Design a protein with these regions (language model features):
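Acidic-and-aromatic substrate-binding clefts and catalytic sites of carbohydrate-active enzymes
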Residues: 40, 69-80, 111, 149-153, ...
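Active-site groove signature of glycoside hydrolases
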Residues: 132-153
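A short, structured active-site edge motif that brings together acidic residues
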Residues: 95-111, 201-205
Length: 366
């Protein structure tokens, strides 16, 4: 190491629920980046993905997250990730050995045909086969039901996912943006029939969206469920970087075709007074922690022990290096500072009451 050069930040790992798998607390995601943004498609996208994925592995990241619907056209992100990973494995077989890499994808939105989306047994099987081909792998470690499917019986979904896991095409399966009730129903349906239960959930979680992860899912982190979480949008699609405080910069995610719904989210946060809170958080991060708001927002997510991993949207190496520095912020965040942050946010959910909480009928007697 050169004089005055800082040592590499240590990567941390957590158990992903009851899967037995250890995942890096920061992971690499492909949503709204590769296969979509200018300069990140086709061959150019593969080159840039390789550069970022290579650095990610060197820094200890072991989970790479994708979905059949990511990219334009759908599946383009999987193709870029698959080709980049294939080339990297040939260039450095040791660091990219398959036994150390965790690959995840999600099934729900496939093609435009009536049977090319949803969670029918047909689409789960055909969608996964297509994803495996694009990713250039024999199996994925984590397979998610990208959303709940109200038109397919839960038992059908559980049986199809069980078949996928037991056929060796996925190591384990989980859900994304399912309610606690839906996850619980699927879990017990699997357990009672000797099938494979869901073992992880991918919810949105950040300083501005807390209720589901901190309250609704609370019972699911305990026995017997032991659900792990791979959280997405830790920066609220960039809102928590502060770059949208004074408008929408050209070339940002909110200007991309197909992501117009994010503008509605921004407007909603403005109405709720979130931008003023973000300014205060940025000042607090700078004056009390000596870091950027981005680092604080990521560190805050990791500080929650029920978060297994935080998915990053990385498009260049410098961005990755910056994000990795959030780990040192996490190490130094005190309980008093977390209370200060809660006071600024003023959105802490009510603690989970459980079966003995205020929601129960009380009997007053002597």
């Amino acid at each position: 190491m050169k004089e005055n050069e800082k040592p590499d930040q240590k990567m941390y790992y957590r158990m992903l629920g009851g899967t037995g798998l250890q995942v890096s607390v920061l992971s690499f995601g492909f949503w709204a980046t590769y296969g979509v943004k200018e300069g990140l498609t086709n061959e150019e996208g593969i080159i840039k993905a390789k550069e970022c994925m290579s650095l990610a592995r060197q820094k200890g990241i072991n989970l790479f997250d994708n979905a059949e619907t990511y990219g334009n056209p759908a599946g383009a992100a999987e193709e870029i990730m698959g080709e980049a990973m294939s080339q990297l494995q040939k260039e450095d077989q040791e660091i990219w050995r398959r036994s150390e890499i965790i690959v995840s994808t999600k099934i729900f939105w496939g093609g435009t045909g009536v049977n090319e989306r949803g969670l029918s047994r047909k689409h789960i099987n055909e969608g996964l086969d297509a994803s495996l081909q694009r990713l250039q792998v024999d199996y994925v470690d984590l397979l998610f039901c990208h959303r709940p499917d109200p038109f397919t019986p839960t038992e059908t979904i559980v049986r199809a996912m069980t078949d996928v896991v037991r056929s060796g095409r996925a190591t384990a399966w989980g859900t994304s943006e399912w309610s606690a009730q839906q996850i619980t129903e699927a879990y017990w349906m699997a357990i009672m029939q000797g099938l494979e239960p869901p073992q992880f959930e991918q919810p949105q979680y950040n300083m501005l969206k807390r209720d589901r992860v901190e309250t609704e899912y609370h019972p699911l982190y305990q026995q017997p469920y032991q659900i792990g979480t791979t959280i997405w949008s830790p920066l609220a699609s960039g809102i928590l970087t502060g770059k949208y405080n004074d408008g929408i910069p050209e070339g940002s995610r909110l200007t991309q075709k197909g992501y117009e719904f994010l503008i509605n989210n921004l407007e909603l946060h403005k109405k709720r007074g979130s931008i003023e809170k973000i300014r205060k958080l940025a000042d607090y991060a700078s004056s009390n922690l000596g870091c950027s708001l981005t680092k604080l927002a990521l560190a805050w997510c990791i500080k929650n022990k029920n978060v297994s991993t935080v998915i990053l949207g990385i498009t260049n190496p410098e961005q990755l290096k910056e994000n990795l520095n959030c780990l040192s912020v996490t190490e130094n965040l005190t309980s008093e500072q977390m209370k200060d942050i809660d006071e600024i946010l003023d959105n802490k959910p009510e603690p989970y009451a459980g079966f003995g909480g205020q929601g129960m009928r009380q009997i007053v007697t002597i």
